[in-house]
Amino acid sequence: MKTILAAYSGVKKGSGSSILSALHDLPTVPWLTRSKMVKHLQVISVLQFIMTFLTMGIACSLLLMYMFCTDFWVISVLYVAWLIYDWNTPGQGGRRSTWVRDWTVWKYMRDYFPIRLIKTHNLLPSRNYIFGYHPHGILCFGAFCNFGTEATGFTKVFPGIKPSLATLAGNFRLPMFREYLMCGGICPVNRNSIDYLLSSNGTGNAVVIVIGGAAESLDCAPGRNSVMLKKRKGFVKLALKQGADLVPVYSFGENEVYKQLIFEEGSWWRTIQRKLQKFLGFAPCLFHGCGLFFPESWGLVPYCKPITTVVGEPITVPKIEEPTQDVIDMYHAMYIRSLKSLFDNYKTRFGLNESDTLIIH
C-alpha cells in the first residue's frame, strides 16, 4: 500500500523519478505487477479529472460557507475579499501555470484512452486563432487533455501558439475551482474574455471553443458522428471582428467513451433536458461508462477508446469591425466545408468506414 501511495504522490507532484522508483519495487508484491500498477494510476487519474469537474466547485462553495461558522471564519473572509478583488481576472487572460499543465497525472490520463494530437498544417505565431472543437462528447476529454494540459505536447507540436480552452463562465464564480481552471489556461466562453485574448494579449493565441456546447452533448453516443453547427455563427463573427483565423478541430472517438440514453426530440424527457440545460448551463445527460472494480458493470469510468484530435487547416479571416450577415454566412459556409473535408480525409484512419458521414445539425 505504501508503494501505491508513493507512486501516486509522484503523479500529483509531477515527479517522474519518484514514480519510477516506486514502481521498481512492485515485483516484490506478487498480486500487483508493474503493468497493473500503471493501469491503476491511469484509472485514478481519469477519475480525479471527472470528480474534480463534477464536485470541486460545489464542495469548495459549501466548505467556504461552513468555515464562516467556525473559528476559521477569517480564512473565508480573506478569500471572499480576494475573490471580489480578483473577479475579472479570468476574463483578462487568467493565471496560466506551466507547472500545473505539466503535471504527470495528465499523462496518465492521456495514456488511459489513449489521447493523441495530430497536426495537419503549421500555425503562425504572428497570427491569432479560434479553434472550433467538435464534437462536445460527454466530458470533453480530448479538449481538456490537448488544450488544457501539456499531456500531448501542444506547445511543442505548435511552437509559439498558446491555447486557451473556453468553458462556461459560471465555473469561474465557484471558489477555488476558478483558480484550478485558470492554472490550465482555461477561460470563460464569453465575448469579453475572447475579445481580450484576441486583441489585448499579443499574437500566437488560440482560443478553443467547443462549438456545439452543452446542447450537443445530449446527442453524443457511440457510433454517432453529428455536430451542432448550422445555427452557431457567433464564433465566426468574433473571428471577423478580431481578424483571427478559423481552425476546424475534430476529435475522433470523443463520442465513444460513454454510452448515453438518448431521447427523441419532442419527447417529454428531451423537453425536460433542454429546459434544465438552459437553466443550469450544462446538459443533464443520462450516461454511463464501466465500473471501477468490475468492467462489465456500470459506472463513471469511461471506456478505453482512443481519442484522436486532428487540428485542421486554418482559414484566413480578414479583420472587419462590423461584418455584414452575408460575410458571416460566407465564412461560416467555408468553415463547414473545411470541417467536413477534415472529417472525410481522416475518418478511415481512426476507426470509421468510408461510408460514414458527418451530420451537421
Swiss-Prot record:
Its main location: endoplasmic reticulum. Keywords: Acyltransferase, Cytoplasm, Endoplasmic reticulum, Glycerol metabolism, Lipid biosynthesis, Lipid droplet, Lipid metabolism, Membrane, Transferase, Transmembrane, Transmembrane helix. One of its GO terms (biological process) is diacylglycerol biosynthetic process. Residues 62-65 are lumenal. GO terms for molecular function: diacylglycerol O-acyltransferase activity; retinol O-fatty-acyltransferase activity. CDD domains: LPLAT_MGAT-like. Essential acyltransferase that catalyzes the terminal and only committed step in triacylglycerol synthesis by using diacylglycerol and fatty acyl CoA as substrates. Required for synthesis and storage of intracellular triglycerides. Probably plays a central role in cytosolic lipid accumulation. Belongs to the diacylglycerol acyltransferase family. This is Diacylglycerol O-acyltransferase 2. PANTHER family: DIACYLGLYCEROL O-ACYLTRANSFERASE, DIACYLGLYCEROL O-ACYLTRANSFERASE 2.
